[in-house]
Structures are given as C-alpha cells and as structure tokens.
Amino acid sequence: ALNWRDGVLKKVWTYDSGATAGKGAYGKGNHSLMTADVDGDGAMELIPGSSTINSDGTFRCATSNTHGDALHVGVLVKGKGISVFMPHESEGGHDAHSADTCAFNFNTSGGSDNGRGVAEWVSASNTTSASCSSNAGSVNCADGKGSAPSAGSNFLIYWDADESRELTGGTSITKSGGGTLLNASGTASCNGTKSTPNLTADILGDWREELILHTTDNTALRIYTTTDVTKRRIYTLMHDPTYRMQVSFEQSSYNQPPHVGFHIGAGMADPPKPDIHVK
C-alpha cells in the first residue's frame, strides 16, 4: 500500500504471502485484485482471490479454495454485505463467499478448469439473490441452489431503463434470456477469446454505463451510450469507492466488469448518498 502526499509516494505496508505472517493467503491469489469496504469502517480491504487482506496489511480470512481466474466482488445477496464470486481453475466448480468472514454461501468442485464466470442481478426474478453463472451452471449466489437467470461469462453493463444489468460480449449488448440491444458494427473486442470491451464505466454520470470499443482498423475509440430514459435515479457510480476502484482494475490483469458496493436490481431501495465534499 502506498500513500500519495504532497506529490510524493510513500510505502505504508507490504503484504507477503510467502512470509509467516501472510501465509494464510498463500496460493489463493487470482490474476486480478479488487478492493471493497467489507466491514463498514470506511477503509478498503483487499480481495486478491480466495482471501481477504485487512486495510492495515494484515491477514483477515481465507476460504479452503485456491487459485481462480474470474473474480467478482459486490453485493450479491440482499442483507449480506459484500460477497465474492469465483469460478475455480484449480478445483473446478465455483463458489460464493463472504468478503468479511470468508464463510461460504456455497462451494462446488470437480471437473476441469472453470476459468470464466459472472455474478450479477440480471433479471427481475433476481429478487433476493444475484445469479452466479459459470461453466458449472447458473445458480443463486445465496446458496448455490435453484436455476437462476444466466449472467453469462463475459462482461456486464447498465444500459436500459430498468435496474437489472445487461450482458456484453464481443461487440454487442444483450438481455439475460434473449434480446439484442446493441450491435456495435465496425468495432472489435479485446483479449482474443475473452472478447472484452476496452472499457465499460459510468463516465457520463447518469448511472447507466458507456461501452467503449476500438474500431476494426485500430484508428479510433468509439463511446456508445444508452438513449433509454429511466425513472430510476442513482448518483453517478464513479462516486461509489468500490465501483471507482474496480473500473481502474479493468485496465489490468484479467479484466472483469466493475461492481458497486450497494444493491442495484429489481426491488432495490434508494441507494445511499455519497459523502463527498469538494473544496
């Protein structure tokens, strides 16, 4: 961890999973790193995969699982705080667990490398739990049971008028269960078979997200924005610390779609107002 003060970077702490004090997180990292305030104290914890590191650089908790590729961190079950969803390369299967305690919501194993997966509130039928979707199936994030609407295995975007999130893959936007909302002709996606966008983020500030893709001749970036009018009012997502940090992670490692630190979905409560003051 580094502090930026008066134009100077200063190291605050280093977490070493190879050292005795950090061994609880050894072998449990992903090809990505996310942050979230998992205990509500105003400071961000680190979630590098199957473990959680405290904001002061000490070990917090870990699951019994090890390495995975995809990583999703956000509110996946109503009333349960921040959860983590991971498909697993080492164990196969997938799991969802508490980012605070690392207790499992559900955990499955077996099969081959399960490298791709997505967790999100993608349908009006997601009333109390988001969908956790991967090659191991699409289930409720709360307990791993039932048959949940598919959240796909690629990227996500808030696009139309309702609170459920849409799916992105390649250069298109679709609704879970069918229906194409956008085909961005003349553009291309990134990262080979992963087919991810250059960026998805709420860069214009009305809480729906923009889709940013490069043209097929690599000469320009195109920004696509929704034209749908919505009655739902949410402050700009970039004022949510969890979301803002996860947008930055899209540009590194195995990029994943950003999640907010509160619930957006069917039946949602009005979100909290950000405590932001500009001098």
Feature locations, PLM:
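Beta-propeller-forming repeat regions
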Residues: A1-K279
